[in-house]
Amino acid sequence: MSESGHSQPGLYGIERRRRWKEPGSSGPQNLSGPGGRERDYIAPWERERRDGSEDPSTNVMQKTPIILSKPPAERSKQPPPSTAPAAPPAPAPLEKPIVLMKPREEGKGPVAATGASTPEGTAPPPPTAPAPPKGEKEGQRPTQPVYQIQNRGMGTAAPTAMDPVVGQAKLLPPERMKHSIKLVDDQMNWCDSAIEYLLDQTDVLVVGVLGLQGTGKSMVMSLLSANTPEEDQRAYVFRAQSAEMKERGGNQTSGIDFFITQERIVFLDTQPILSPSILDHLINNDRKLPPEYNLPHTYVEMQSLQIAAFLFTVCHVVIVVQDWFTDLSLYRFLQTAEMVKPSTPSPSHESSSAAGSDEGTEYYPHLVFLQNKARREDFCPRKLRQMHLMIDQLMAHSHLRYKGTLSMLQCNIFPGLPPDFLDAEVNLFLVPFMDSEAENENPPRAGPGSSPLFSLLPGYRGHPSFQSLVSKLRSQVMSMARPQLSHTILTEKNWFHYAARIWDGVKKSSALAEYSRLLA
């Protein structure tokens, strides 16, 4: 056959027949039929030569069934001219597969494309799947595969994109605070900066402090939270009173300072209650008082009551620091703050009415009396018993938990005393002077130029070391029970919002307003 496809007359003779028989197999050959001889006796190398010399347009049409590798596709390749006019109504079904295949390629990549084409039996590449608009099977393709692709994309791509970030955020340690920040400023306004350090977890302990001016509240809170006695006081998280401030008779802390440790313990340091320096500042600087207060000393006392009532509502433990035993006005102040304390919101009216009294639903914190700068004679067992008995009598009518949660006898501070030595043991703890350790480093001498007496023995102090007592106090405070502050369990962030509402309620309290009118 020539390149044009017509037969040549001299090629069907005996010579051609014999020439083809020589290289071929010796099996039987069928020479019957008008075109059977040409179709049966074409050699393989002759077929390759003829295929290469054919028109490229026909070659493209012959390669299509080879790619799809489907015998039925050869029969369907002839009617493209008849289906060509039907192409214009096809764009409507074509738009859906193209748009809905995009999330499959973004979420699953090439795996989604192969997975969608394999069960349908169409061409592997995604662009060729919507090209042939055929019968009913083609019309079902935009609905069923797309529904499966959407589920796979949303079920696998979203978790893989979010889980690593969420997992890393949970594994990261909380941000460590290096110094305290303001929770309530000197103008008695609430500050929102502390919420950045809080987490969504419920295991939190809140410790507050109250005390007169110069008793060492900031130093005690720094030692309990993050510092040690050996560190420089200027590096404490709660700034202690400087020497210049002591000489001027001023106060270092104003408002309420906030600090949270890595153990998720919140410490609240407050300004001194009934402070004469704050009163002097109001009088000498001509600060304008709020309209509801007429006298400066009334305003100072109401500020102190607001802070104390706030701590009694939002703290698990409140430490009352005093540097001498004892000031009766301090206990009178504590009873007044307990009286004007905001009531704890009850879960329902039925439960509060069924209780019959406010004691069952009202919240009261643990109260710890800390005797700072204690002398040697204060650690005498007889003096210790008198102190416990007096505090028990002064706080006999209080609902605050001032006894039963802290004990110096159980800390092995007095190893010779029996556990029942104190008839009425209250939450009292004694801490000596911080500088007493340096004084004991110089042992007594017999004379100016003589050697020290008992140089091989430590000096008698009458009490354990300052570091040991602070460590025992810290362990007891941190191991105290954490009662529920509200009728619902509060996380750290929930506690912050709860405290903000309590502070706003304290400032607008009708009980405090009535008490201020009685003072005037």
Curated annotation (Swiss-Prot):
Mod. after translation: Phosphorylated by SMG1.
Residue ranges with Low complexity bias: 112-121
Subunit (UniProt): Self-associates to form homodimers and forms heterodimers with SMG8; these assembly forms may represent SMG1C intermediate forms. Component of the SMG1C complex composed of SMG1, SMG8 and SMG9. Interacts with DHX34; the interaction is RNA-independent.
UniProt name for this protein: Nonsense-mediated mRNA decay factor SMG9
Annotated positions of the N-acetylserine modification: S2
GO biological process: brain development; eye development; heart development; in utero embryonic development; negative regulation of apoptotic process; nuclear-transcribed mRNA catabolic process, nonsense-mediated decay
Similarity remark: Belongs to the SMG9 family.
Gene behind this protein: Smg9
One function term, GO molecular function aspect: identical protein binding
Positions with biased composition (Pro residues): 78-94, 122-133
PTM sites of type Phosphoserine: S2, S4, S7, S32, S53, S451
InterPro entries according to UniProt: P-loop_NTPase, SMG9
Keywords tagged on the record: Acetylation, Nonsense-mediated mRNA decay, Phosphoprotein
Domain of life: Eukaryota
Function recorded in the entry: Involved in nonsense-mediated decay (NMD) of mRNAs containing premature stop codons. Is recruited by release factors to stalled ribosomes together with SMG1 and SMG8 (forming the SMG1C protein kinase complex) and, in the SMG1C complex, is required for the efficient association between SMG1 and SMG8. Plays a role in brain, heart, and eye development.
